[in-house]
Curated annotation (Swiss-Prot):
One of its GO terms (cellular component) is 90S preribosome. It is found in: Nucleus, Nucleolus. The lineage of its organism: Eukaryota, Fungi, Dikarya, Ascomycota, Saccharomycotina. The gene is RRP36. Associates with 90S and pre-40S pre-ribosomal particles. Keywords: Coiled coil, Nucleus, Ribonucleoprotein, Ribosome biogenesis, rRNA processing. The keyword Nucleus applies. It comes from Yarrowia lipolytica (strain CLIB 122 / E 150) (Yeast). Residues 1-135, 214-238, 261-280 are annotated as: Disordered. Belongs to the RRP36 family. This is rRNA biogenesis protein RRP36. InterPro entries: RRP36. Residues 1-16, 268-280 have a biased composition (Basic and acidic residues).
Length: 280
């Protein structure tokens, strides 16, 4: 106890000496000149400086506790951290209130608008959502959906047979336009369009001819079945031969020779390919 009392006494004397040095330094700073200031010891100057720094800190703490100051512009000045920390938490400070249940939804204006828009009547599938929707089709159209079965090609051909006449008219217009055009680039584009339309029209005509030949053969077999004879239904290879034979009957000799030569080259190329692949 005696030792603690001695320590407290020493601290009190040290504080008194510091305060005396500070008072002396402050009085000399106000009333004396530089000659009297130079007579002070370094210890007294240091202690006085510590007391001044402590007073400045106390003043700054009292200013911050008193509230935000108003600058010359008329708005409140506060720290950035304080504003962010209290944002949305203090309802008394005018922060954002809780959203109402039936309030309209808000969307960010920075979000990009999707290129793919919803189409009424079509269900949009999200890829990766489930195993059934993991395909390249984004929209499902019931007209071309495989789950509804295969399309009736014969019925489709009958319903849209009138388009052949439009294709022929378009080919005639493009051919007339080709005669008037002199630029090579535009001519090549027109020729490509003409070849595409002619190829499509030729494919449809071949399909119609094949269907006609096979229907006639089936009709003959039905009539023979009515007469008591056994019907004979052709295999696919026999169907191709029958269609090819009937096709040659309708062609000219020049076209037949050209078709035979083309077919001979095709078969020869296939045989050569099979021969070289067999060596490997």
């Amino acid at each position: 106890m005696k030792r603690d009392s001695n320590r407290n006494l020493v601290r009190k004397r040290a504080d008194d000496s510091d305060s005396d040095d500070y008072n002396t330094f402050a009085g000399l700073e106000k009333d004396s000149g530089p000659e009297e200031m130079s007579s002070l010891s370094f210890g007294a100057i240091r202690n006085a400086q510590k007391n001044l720094d402590k007073e400045n800190e106390d003043d700054s703490d009292s200013d911050s506790d008193s509230g935000p100051e108003e600058n010359s512009g008329g708005y409140e000045r506060s720290s950035y951290k304080g504003n962010n920390k209290g944002k949305g938490n203090n309802k008394e400070d005018g922060g954002p209130k809780k959203r109402l249940k039936h309030a309209p939804s808000e969307a960010s204006s920075k979000k990009r608008v999707s290129v793919i828009r919803p189409i009424p009547g079509l269900t949009m599938t999200k890829s990766g959502a489930d195993s059934a929707s993991r395909d390249s089709k984004l929209y499902r159209d019931i007209r071309f959906d495989a789950t509804y079965g295969k399309a009736n090609e014969d019925r489709v051909r009958e319903d849209y047979a009138f388009l052949d006449e439009y294709r022929r008219e378009e080919i005639a217009e493009l051919q007339a336009k080709l005669k008037k055009t002199e630029e090579s680039y535009i001519r090549s584009q027109i020729q490509t369009q003409i070849q595409s339309l002619q190829s499509k029209l030729k494919t449809l005509e071949k399909r119609d001819f094949r269907k006609k030949v096979l229907n006639e053969h089936r009709q003959q077999q039905r009539e023979q079945a009515k007469d008591g004879k056994n019907p004979y239904y052709l295999k696919r290879s026999d169907q191709r031969k029958l269609v090819l034979t009937e096709q040659f009957k309708t062609m000219k000799k020049k076209d037949i020779d050209r078709a035979i030569e083309r077919r001979r080259k095709k078969i020869t190329g296939k045989e050569k390919k099979d021969m070289f692949s067999g060596r490997d």
